[in-house]
């Protein structure tokens, strides 16, 4: 006799039979192994993200440098003491050192030569000529390594997929953008800024020559992108400003001049001249004169006294 509250034995057997029949109809639960899970197709959105990341991977250092520039200038626009600016300079030097490790040894040498050459141009342009002036009336410590970052930005551009695929057409597109900016600086922008940017337009032929005639055109074309961002943020945030009329030449200028990248091209071309001089000196003096070499030379010429 079944206990009260429990279904009849036949009913229980019927329930069990029905549940077993259900399992038999549905079959065993499917277990996905690692290979089956890997073979499952991902969503179209996942494929899109993966493809975009793969395409952007060769440009990560360029994106990093383009991101660091406005953050650096924003921080400099907020500081009030020189030691804070020195800290930004030290940070930028460290960043330049780490970023330059991605370049071959010869290019790293060019980057550091650019730092020295650009420092000389900065002292002349800002402190002597005075065509532009920094907020604290000095040459900030982050400016020399900043030139090195711009130069490195251009050097690494030659190995990017877009340059390798499209070649000089990339330079022609950038040159067209520079020409458009120069034209606007003479026509439309004066109505908004009150400045006629003749100085920027005069830099356009210099920039065009380097882009169209130089075998290192990717360097100079990429410099326009880096310096364009640098100058726009630097003048907008008040880190420096260009005088409305340049001293000595009395040429009107925008703030910033449109194709000032032409001036940067002159700086970077000077780096190549210095490099040739360095290699010429190496040919004349093939031996490296380190401290150990000098001491060995001195001690080898000293004979003991009798």
What are these regions (language model features)?
Residues 10, 31-32, 36-306:
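Aromatic-rich, lipid-facing transmembrane alpha helices and their immediate juxtamembrane interface loops
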Residues 12-15, 25:
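Charged/polar low-complexity intrinsically disordered segments
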């Amino acid at each position: 006799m079944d206990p009260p509250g429990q279904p009849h034995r036949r009913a229980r057997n019927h329930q069990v039979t029905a549940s077993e029949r259900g399992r038999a109809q549905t079959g065993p639960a499917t277990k996905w192994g690692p290979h089956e899970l890997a073979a499952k197709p991902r969503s179209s959105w996942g494929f899109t993200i993966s493809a975009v990341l793969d395409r952007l991977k060769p440009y990560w250092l360029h994106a990093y440098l383009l991101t660091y520039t406005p953050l650096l200038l924003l921080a400099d626009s907020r500081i009030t003491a020189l030691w804070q600016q020195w800290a930004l300079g030290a940070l930028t030097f460290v960043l330049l050192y780490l970023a330059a490790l991605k370049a071959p040894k010869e290019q790293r040498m060019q980057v550091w030569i650019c730092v020295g050459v650009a420092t000389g141009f900065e002292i002349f342009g800002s402190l002597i000529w005075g065509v532009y002036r920094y907020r604290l009336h000095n040459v900030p410590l982050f400016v020399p390594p900043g030139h090195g970052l711009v130069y490195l930005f251009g050097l690494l551009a030659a190995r990017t997929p877009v340059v390798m695929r499209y070649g000089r057409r990339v330079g022609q597109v950038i040159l067209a953008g520079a020409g458009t900016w120069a034209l606007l600086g003479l026509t439309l922008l004066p109505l908004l800024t009150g400045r006629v940017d003749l100085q920027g337009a005069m830099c356009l032929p210099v920039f065009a020559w380097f882009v169209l005639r130089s075998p290192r055109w990717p360097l100079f074309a990429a410099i326009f992108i880096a310096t364009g961002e640098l100058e726009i943020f630097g003048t907008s945030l008040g880190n420096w400003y260009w005088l409305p009329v340049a001293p000595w030449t009395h040429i009107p200028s925008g703030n910033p001049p449109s194709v000032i990248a032409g001036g940067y091209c002159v700086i970077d071309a000077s780096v190549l001249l210095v490099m040739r001089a360095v290699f010429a000196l190496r040919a004349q003096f093939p031996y490296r004169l380190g401290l150990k070499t000098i001491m060995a030379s001195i001690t080898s010429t000293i004979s003991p006294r009798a």
